[in-house]
Amino acid sequence: HIAAGGKAFQLFDSWVGALSPNDFRVFVLPVIERIFHELSDLQVPKIYFPGVASGELLPELTNVKADVIGLDWRVSIAEGRRRLNNKVAVQGNLDPTILQAPQHIIEQHAAAIIDQGIEQPGYIFNLGHGLYPEASLDKLKSLTEFIHTYSEKKLLQRT
């Protein structure tokens, strides 16, 4: 995909959070480290998303050569950064079920996440997991517009 013009690489490890930290450390982490080491020459951002319920695994990821670590909605942006020793950018972490709520509720949740994210450099807004099939494309479009407008406003306030 990168050769065809992809702008980033993301490894989704959606259910690794089901493992204990020890099993993750023994059976999965060496493979993740090898994958990202072998991709180190790629000239695009490399993202690792350890999936749902993976907050306890975050301290194990501080030496993975990913540029960004994705967070699910169960760990705040601030706590995720702390567990990663502020060594890497983070991405996330809107609960995808919020997309079933009215637009103003979606925007409240998105604003709270953005407010945490922009406290330090190295943040990408995203969902904390994948979309559900019933997700409304209109709500996603409105959310995207809100993210752009709100983020720009907040960044301008900081300067």
Identify what each model region corresponds to.
Residues 1-159:
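Active-site loop segments of alpha/beta catalytic cores
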